[in-house]
Amino acid sequence: MKLIVKMATRSRPEKFKTVLQQYIDFLSGENEVRFVITCDLDDETMNTDDMREWFEETRKSVDLVYRYGHSKTKVEACNADLEDEDGDVLLVVSDDMIPAAMNYDSIIAQGFAEVFPNYDGAIKFNDGLRNDALMTLPCLGWKLYKAIGHCYHPDYTSLYCDDEQTRLCGMLGKLAVCEMIIARHEWIPGDHENADDLHKRNESYYGVDGEVFRRRAENNFDVDEVRERLGLPVPAKS
């Protein structure tokens, strides 16, 4: 299995380095794994000579590419820099998704071999925080990812994008659930005493993104178009 691990980051260089190194250290060595990192050119904490040197040193021991761009939103950053990539599974992580299982790549490989051997589905792993069906750690077969056309729908800024992703995969009949925790979601609300400016900014979009979600839901999240791209039967319109 070839696993693409996508990570977008901003304004948290030390936390980012710690978490990324954990993702590297927790690999089994049994699968092909490539890390794709997206940073912002206007981020003075990440766009530094020291950070670039750290990236170059890390690249000596792992397949990793890092790119600096002009992402205007969290969703845009998550979607960025994947257009020239290819793999079997896409795993989208962040610096608040802390690795919790050694050999997580082999756990993912085994899961897809069991439920989506053609890599045309998604697996929702328990994130250690929520008990509902929401997939907060996107783990998408590459065929499904390409059929959808993005990780998160680009109309969103920060929030509700995972709600759409989860519902769309469920509507397609392409969502499996695994109670194993491969990464623990250490999320804190924007009003928490430890919340930084990025937390607060990302959580300020509830109203805007909530309206996007309602509008997208009225259109069934374009599920029929995705069905067609996957080669699934499309129900006749009444």
Please report, for each region that a protein language model flagged, where it lies by residue.
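Active-site nucleotide-sugar/metal-binding loop of Leloir-type enzymes
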Residues: 79-89
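Conserved donor NDP-sugar-binding/catalytic core segment of glycosyltransferases
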Residues: 97-98, 102-135, 142
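Short beta-strand/loop segment that forms part of the nucleotide-sugar
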Residues: 31-44, 67-69
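Short, acidic, metal-binding catalytic loop of nucleotide-sugar glycosyltransferases
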Residues: 21-32
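Active-site beta-to-alpha loop of glycosyltransferases that engages the nucleotide-sugar donor
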Residues: 7-18, 41-43, 72
